[in-house]
């Protein structure tokens, strides 16, 4: 599972990862727009073939039970489970911007990560 928000190491929701092992610190392929939705949470938007940004995150080996029972129930309504392309071309489950979600959001793609956004907002 590719995490790019508060569940990353050091984040407020990292406890939700439990004992799942960290597989890699990596980025997505450069095909995403990265948003701060209502200033509260990050969201990846796939631009497809259009040029986007590579977004920082962490990949964890989480069980489906962990996803179903612990991580996913706490996710905001503006996100849905999807698959993202990582820098090495492989795919990973991740939370992405829900199709049709219209909440106010700010494009933070140039920052390439949620931590950088939070540091700049503090």
Located regions from the model:
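Glycine-aromatic micro-motifs
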Residues: 1-122
């Amino acid at each position: 599972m590719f995490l790019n928000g508060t569940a990353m190491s050091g984040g407020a929701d990292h406890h939700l990862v439990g004992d799942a092992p960290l597989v890699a610190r990596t980025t997505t392929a450069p095909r995403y727009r990265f948003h701060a939705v209502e200033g509260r949470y990050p969201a990846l938007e796939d631009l497809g073939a259009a040029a986007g940004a590579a977004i920082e995150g962490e990949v964890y080996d989480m069980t489906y039970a962990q996803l179903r029972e612990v991580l996913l129930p706490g996710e905001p309504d503006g996100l849905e489970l999807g698959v993202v392309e990582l820098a090495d071309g492989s795919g990973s489950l991740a939370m992405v911007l829900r199709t049709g979600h219209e909440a106010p959001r700010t494009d933070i793609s140039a920052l390439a990560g949620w931590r950088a956004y939070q540091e700049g907002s503090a």
